[in-house]
Amino acid sequence: MNGQNIRIRLKAFDHRVLDTSTREIVNTAKRTGAQVRGPIPLPTRIEKFTVNRSPHVDKKSREQFEMRTHKRLLDIVDPTPQTVDALMKLDLAAGVDVEIKL
């Protein structure tokens, strides 16, 4: 796999779970002899929702909720076939979205 890079993009709502999954991927890639660039923290997407507290009256009384999506980016430079096999077998935590581009 000469000259190829693997770009891994991770997303999660909980940054602690995201960081542990990122660490697992980095350790697995380094253990198989690949060079890793990152993890690069990407901007956190914050979605805010404003709703009425009461279903009937008091329009001025509102409550706000927010949902944060944390993201990380990893580049694996010149991966070996062992690296690809190890990454395919890796079991990550639930709640982490993984996008892989070759």
Curated annotation (Swiss-Prot):
Pfam families named in the record: Ribosomal_S10 (PF00338)
Keywords of the record: Ribonucleoprotein, Ribosomal protein
GO molecular function, one term: tRNA binding
InterPro entries: Ribosomal_uS10, Ribosomal_uS10_CS, Ribosomal_uS10_dom, Ribosomal_uS10_dom_sf
GO biological process: translation
Superkingdom to which the source organism belongs: Bacteria
Any one GO cellular component localisation term in the record: ribosome
Assembly and interaction partners: Part of the 30S ribosomal subunit.
Entry's family note: Belongs to the universal ribosomal protein uS10 family.
UniProt cross-references to NCBIfam families, sorted A to Z: PRK00596.1, rpsJ_bact
Biological function: Involved in the binding of tRNA to the ribosomes.
Protein name: Small ribosomal subunit protein uS10
Source organism: Afipia carboxidovorans (strain ATCC 49405 / DSM 1227 / KCTC 32145 / OM5) (Oligotropha carboxidovorans)
Gene behind this protein: rpsJ
